[in-house]
Amino acid sequence: KRFSAIGHFSEGLAPARGKIQWGYIDKENQEILPFKYDIAEPFYNNIARVGLYGKSMKINKQGSECL
């Protein structure tokens, strides 16, 4: 897969941008979380802030929203 941008690796994952949207990859460049986010920040304490459909939220490493 080609990425137009890759963020900093943190806790084994990095945010990466595909053609338009962001997802998360591991150090082998394998997709771990789908490329569906408008914004994606690095993980910190197993939580990352993402933007989806104009909404800011926090997700865990499984992609589930955290409150």
Describe the residue ranges of each PLM region:
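Residue-level detector of conserved, function-critical positions
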Residues: K1-L67
